[in-house]
Swiss-Prot record:
Participates actively in the response to hyperosmotic and heat shock by preventing the aggregation of stress-denatured proteins and by disaggregating proteins, also in an autonomous, DnaK-independent fashion. Unfolded proteins bind initially to DnaJ; upon interaction with the DnaJ-bound protein, DnaK hydrolyzes its bound ATP, resulting in the formation of a stable complex. GrpE releases ADP from DnaK; ATP binding to DnaK triggers the release of the substrate protein, thus completing the reaction cycle. A zinc finger (CR-type) spans 135-217. Gene3D superfamilies: DnaJ domain, Heat shock protein DnaJ, cysteine-rich domain, Urease metallochaperone UreE, N-terminal domain. The J domain is necessary and sufficient to stimulate DnaK ATPase activity. Zinc center 1 plays an important role in the autonomous, DnaK-independent chaperone activity of DnaJ. Zinc center 2 is essential for interaction with DnaK and for DnaJ activity. GO terms for molecular function: ATP binding; heat shock protein binding; unfolded protein binding; zinc ion binding. One of its GO terms (biological process) is protein refolding. One of its GO terms (cellular component) is cytoplasm. Zn(2+) 1 binds at residues 148, 151, 205, 208. The keyword Zinc-finger applies. It comes from Parageobacillus thermoglucosidasius. Belongs to the DnaJ family. This is Chaperone protein DnaJ. It is found in: Cytoplasm. Its cofactor is Zn(2+).
Amino acid sequence: MAKRDYYEILGVSKNATKEEIKKAYRKLSKKYHPDINKEPDAAEKFKEIKEAYEVLSDDQKRAHYDQFGHADPNQGFGGFRSDDFDFGGFSGFSGFDDIFSTFFGGGRRRDPNAPRAGADLQYTMTLTFEEAVFGKETDIEIPREETCNTCHGTGAKPGTKKETCSYCHGTGQISTEQSTPFGRIVNRRTCPYCGGTGQYIKERCTTCGGTGRVKRRKKIHVKIPAGIDDGQQLRVAGQGEPGINGGPPGDLYIVFHVEPHEFFERDGDDIYCEIPLTFAQAALGDEIEVPTLHGKVRLKIPAGTQTGTKFRLKGKGVPNVRGYGYGDQHVIVRVVTPTKLTEKQKQLLREFDQLGGSSMHQGPHGRFFEKVKKAFKGES
């Protein structure tokens, strides 16, 4: 059966002070003392309360528990590295460490106190079609961890400081020596009590609980470039989480989702749209007004324009996000067939068809109809 959390047993938070822990222990130990409480599980609960207090009332045991929980960091084979061992009896074998490097990953032990870069963050932003095309400036709020202002990132209560770990004497490592038929082997492990830092916090900062960090929402002003597209991302340098031990902060990556437009479609820097034409406009030609992202323009439709014909409006597309000019707008015309005709309109169309004579049988469409007719007659 898994052990219960010590903080849960005493009914205190992980940021509880020594006095709060002591007060909770006295109250619970009195309630569940076997001489007072005659319930069957009282003795077991009393034992559990006592064990929790013994750990949480001791600074180093508490630091060890906060890092590893109930697990024993000295168990198992994890953490084995070539640099964990000092092969005293193999001084003549210069390549022995290389062999361990090959099989176990090698590399020197990372200094836990060395500066490390902060984590990168990702934020998803939704833009309208127009905002993506023309760009915008806006403020966003990012939830992130920041350095605690109370302890300035040390994790220690103001007026106190971290103390040297008495288990590893500030080295961050614990060594065990073993004699083998091949010589003396010294096994060096990360100190489980200080986590390899060589220090521990005796009195924790009550604001951050000893972590040196707090969760906050950071307001950031963002300038979105014109021409950003769906799925693209923008890197904002230095706006990720703060670095560790004086390391540089991480970066913020904003990923954009662009809403579709009801009229325009985008493909890269080019814009596509469809414009309806009547029979008369397509047959006789016309000059129409076409909406673009940059305002309305006049487009000349030549006589005899067929449905599906594409016209290009140069430079009327999306500005390139890297500043390489503008894309184009492609206008595709669709000839609309009327569905509700008056008797007069029907009569006029019949007359038009009669007046057209064999004109429909000329050109590519006419040749197609002739081939169909011959096929049904069996002509070759």
